[in-house]
From Swiss-Prot:
GO terms for cellular component: 3-isopropylmalate dehydratase complex. It comes from Xanthomonas euvesicatoria pv. vesicatoria (strain 85-10). Belongs to the LeuD family. LeuD type 1 subfamily. This is 3-isopropylmalate dehydratase small subunit. GO terms for molecular function: 3-isopropylmalate dehydratase activity. Pathway: Amino-acid biosynthesis; L-leucine biosynthesis; L-leucine from 3-methyl-2-oxobutanoate: step 2/4. It catalyses: (2R,3S)-3-isopropylmalate = (2S)-2-isopropylmalate. GO terms for biological process: L-leucine biosynthetic process. The keyword Lyase applies. Catalyzes the isomerization between 2-isopropylmalate and 3-isopropylmalate, via the formation of 2-isopropylmaleate.
Amino acid sequence: MTPFTQHTGLVAPLDRANVDTDQIIPKQFLKSIKRTGFGPNLFDEWRYLDIGEPGRDNSTRPLNPEFVLNFPRYQGASVLLARENFGCGSSREHAPWALDEYGFRTVIAPSFADIFYNNSFKNGLLPIVLAEAQVDALFEQCLATEGYQLTVDLAAQRVRRPDGVEYGFDIDAFRKHCLLNGLDDIGLTLQDADAIGRFEQGHRARQPWLFGALQ
């Protein structure tokens, strides 16, 4: 998992509340258990004018000119600005996978659905909760300023606007540690690889009959 320390990126404003996981990545794309291949179908039903199908070449599909991520000014955005209850609906880890593969490093909103919030941390996507008035101010500036960027400093737990105004945000210490060091569940486990190896050797010595049956 890519470490998250400090990130400055172009902001895309998704001015919709209660965006659910089926809108983030529609159900027909969930057949794959791989973590890749979902970015092109992020917000599929909003980005395109037709119905998407797995394996289809998206480069030939008609884009919805009214959807924010299709606006030329937001191409290359890596910070998603959203409204309350982002990521509600069914539990699907594919949602943060799709956001991450599209290029988003962080999502800023007044609130998130609990399961999506937890899944995001496990997949290197930083969900930031700010006060609604602060999010309103960011939307106002973003919509008024082409090329609007924000800087997110995870170590300091601050979001910095171009005018120097900063907003603090809360994050669990363990989740912060994992993001700063690029540790997902597998990475955390591998930190104890030596101890696990010693346990397996001892277990094999104590109960060799168990391992003999597997040979």
